Amino acid sequence: MKKLFLLLIIALILGSSACAKPAPTPEAALSLQGKSILMIIAHQGFRDEEYQEPRQLFEARGATITVASSSLETAKGSLGAQVKPDLLLKNMTVSDYDAIVFIGGPGAQEYWNDPVAHAIVQEAVAQSKVLAAICIAPATLAKAGVLKGKNATVFSSEAEALKAGGANYTDASVERDGLIITANGPQAAARFAEEIAKALEE
């Protein structure tokens, strides 16, 4: 009887260990640990999903997020989101970040011809940072002169701005050319975020 009882206990132990699933490694879950990402939003009228979805993914993978804008007052999204920026765009230092991400929405026009935004874009390329923009924000990159000869996409209304800046406009939902990643609107926000994460993980 005792022997049978012992055999039953051993069988239960072996069965439970065989069914146990290995815990996911922290490295896999936090693939962006130690990475610093600057997200640039318009003071008024940034696109909510284009900010929220990438930020959620970046933070879930361990990245540190900083938000910059043209004002430190609470920024308002076109769908009602409210975000308190961490610093003024003019006070940021490109070398502090691994990626610079321009968020779109109608308000993103404020950076199209902004010399501060252009200087950030140009410095990001010079320092080999991941540089990304979504919706109408890729027009800022084009006007800053960094898309010449590059494959890029944008919200369809600004296709001509990209072409005028020398880009090869592809009309893709998400486009990557080296360390420059562009996307054409909120429906591409999740994939846009994945491409940025992939570039940072390389």
Q: What annotation goes with each model-predicted range?
A:
Residues 135:
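Catalytic nucleophile serine of serine hydrolases
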Residues 131-132, 152:
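A short beta-strand/loop micro-motif in the catalytic core of glycosyltransferases
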Residues 1-4:
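Positively charged n-region of N-terminal signal peptides that target proteins for export
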Residues 8, 104, 154-156:
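Residues that line or immediately flank small-molecule/substrate-binding pockets and catalytic motifs
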Residues 19-127, 131, 140-144, 161-171, ...:
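Extended, subdomain-level signal for the structured scaffold at the beginning of enzyme domains
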Residues 7-16:
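Bacterial N-terminal signal peptides
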Residues 148-156, 169-172:
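Short hydrophobic/aromatic-enriched beta-strand-loop microsegments
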